[in-house]
Amino acid sequence: MGCVSMTLGIDEAGRGCLAGSLFVAGVACNEKTALEFLKMGLKDSKKLSLKKRFFLEYKIKTHGEVGFFVVKKSANEIDSLGLGACLKLAVQEILENGCSLVDEIKIDGNTAFGLNKRYPHIQTIIKGDETIAQIAMASVLAKAFKDREMLELHALFKEYGWDKNCGYGTKQHIEAIIKLGATPFHRHSFTLKNRILNPKLLEVEQRLI
């Protein structure tokens, strides 16, 4: 990759889901390569179609001048360790693998999870997936992994609408949990916290509002 300045962008997908894994991705490349991806239509993954995300994922993974890392934390790990700890561990793993390759590290959001003491050149950027190409590339990669996981799980549990909601707490998804209960792929710490698994309590609360 030569001596050209390299930037590592980090972003996640699945943070606020009720089901499935958290995926954290890191993508490292120089500005010339980043520009190539912007010309391909790269932007914040939430603004791309599923087909376009999978297309860009393929391009990221097969480009000779791009380094990439994806870390998965399962629903069980999130329940055991907590979401914050899982995010930190995933970011840390990416930094340990990618830090030596790059000159700059840019993380989407407003926290470096305390890792800026060990990696002082980390920058946190709110809505970084809208302004930094490498973060947008990481966003696409993480979201594509999350999309694929939930499509595969949807084949096993069609009633929860995971092909459409991707594990997020939509009305249909919550109603399915109330009616059918949670699957082994649900984050029980999330569903219990939101009182979803106790519909009687939920009805009482609605009457109190």
From Swiss-Prot:
Organism this protein belongs to: Helicobacter pylori (strain ATCC 700392 / 26695) (Campylobacter pylori)
Protein location: Cytoplasm
GO biological process, one term: DNA replication, removal of RNA primer
Domain of life (superkingdom): Bacteria
GO molecular function: manganese ion binding; RNA binding; RNA-DNA hybrid ribonuclease activity
Note on how the cofactor is bound: Manganese or magnesium. Binds 1 divalent metal ion per monomer in the absence of substrate. May bind a second metal ion after substrate binding.
Lineage: Bacteria, Pseudomonadati, Campylobacterota, Epsilonproteobacteria, Campylobacterales
UniProt cofactor(s): Mn(2+); Mg(2+)
Function field: Endonuclease that specifically degrades the RNA of RNA-DNA hybrids.
Protein family according to the UniProt entry: Belongs to the RNase HII family.
Protein name stated in the entry: Ribonuclease HII
HAMAP family: RNase_HII_B (MF_00052_B)
Chief place of localization: cytoplasm
RNase H type-2 domain mapped to chain residues: 5-202
InterPro entries in alphabetical order: RNase_HII, RNase_HII/HIII, RNase_HII/HIII_dom, RNaseH-like_sf, RNaseH_sf
